[in-house]
Amino acid sequence: MSNLNKRPDWIKVKAPNSAEYYNTKDLIKNLRLNTVCEEAACPNIGECWSKKHATVMILGSVCTRACRFCNVKTGRPDLLDPHEPQRLAEAVQKLNLKHVVITSVDRDDLDDGGATHFAECISEIRKSSPNTTIEILTPDFLRKEGAAEIIANAKPDVFNHNVETVPSLYKTIRPGARYYNSLSLLHNIKKLSPEIFTKSGMMVGLGEEISEVIQVMDDLREAKVDFLTIGQYLQPTKNHAEVAKYVTPEEFKYLERIARTKGFLMVSATPLTRSSYHADEDFQKLKENYQQRHCEEAWPA
């Protein structure tokens, strides 16, 4: 597998420099919050923060796993911060967010994998910003009995868990996870709370075959997933997995067309697509697509 050092023009972005970007950065810093935008070196940080969109990362900034694609620090995590849910709710209120995305590191050291902390964050936001819709992007809660029930009972508007890549690459790219456990988690959340929209994403350009990507689409639809995101893998550092291919915009359009035939309510497939990219706008489209598909049914409460 060759290392493709030069990124093509279609995935180059401008460096952030707007006043709104720095305002968002200062607020996040002052409230002592972590964001996946910074920790994972997201290429869309300038655009999102300029719009006051940020994906907050709870449960600390140190992950218990070492996935080969991820730039988040790995090691021994800190103790849980009991005041984090309140600070997060304060940030949501100050930013006047209509839609918030909350993610986390993996916390295999916790009995519930951090599920209760997610639920507490949702509860605090509901108290101070009842009109804000909440999307959570969680780890897989591997071997954490009862975690799915805790999350489902917390009733986020969107539950997102990424399968990340095709099953054949799990041992090298996502060694601490199990593909079918991820599918099971997505399916269980939908089964426990059908009104929650479910979402999952994957990267391409890691050496997967097109046929494998299509099989993942089928598996996700079998798990009743509503929204699929597909984006280009970008190597964070030389210590991470190398890029096997830069997938062209035309190839992404092809994948999107195939995914739409599978029955997803929403599909986003572009080189710069990330799980939380345009999450606010996409949630509105998701609701509209649901209503169009179920025009004779009542909107779920």
Swiss-Prot record:
Q: Look up the record and name the pathway of this protein.
A: Protein modification; protein lipoylation via endogenous pathway; protein N(6)-(lipoyl)lysine from octanoyl-[acyl-carrier-protein]: step 2/2
Q: Which reaction does it catalyse?
A: [[Fe-S] cluster scaffold protein carrying a second [4Fe-4S](2+) cluster] + N(6)-octanoyl-L-lysyl-[protein] + 2 oxidized [2Fe-2S]-[ferredoxin] + 2 S-adenosyl-L-methionine + 4 H(+) = [[Fe-S] cluster scaffold protein] + N(6)-[(R)-dihydrolipoyl]-L-lysyl-[protein] + 4 Fe(3+) + 2 hydrogen sulfide + 2 5'-deoxyadenosine + 2 L-methionine + 2 reduced [2Fe-2S]-[ferredoxin]
Species, as recorded: Rickettsia felis (strain ATCC VR-1525 / URRWXCal2) (Rickettsia azadi)
Q: What is this protein called?
A: Lipoyl synthase
Query: What is the cofactor note?
Result: Binds 2 [4Fe-4S] clusters per subunit. One cluster is coordinated with 3 cysteines and an exchangeable S-adenosyl-L-methionine.
GO cellular-component term (any): cytoplasm
* Obligatory cofactor(s): [4Fe-4S] cluster
EC class name: transferase
Q: Which SMART domains match?
A: Elp3
This protein's source sits in the domain of life called: Bacteria
- Which of this chain's residues are annotated to bind [4Fe-4S] cluster 1? C37, C42, C48, S276
Question: Which InterPro entries does the UniProt record give?
Answer: Aldolase_TIM, Elp3/MiaA/NifB-like_rSAM, LIAS_N, Lipoyl_synth, rSAM
As for subcellular location, the record says:
Cytoplasm
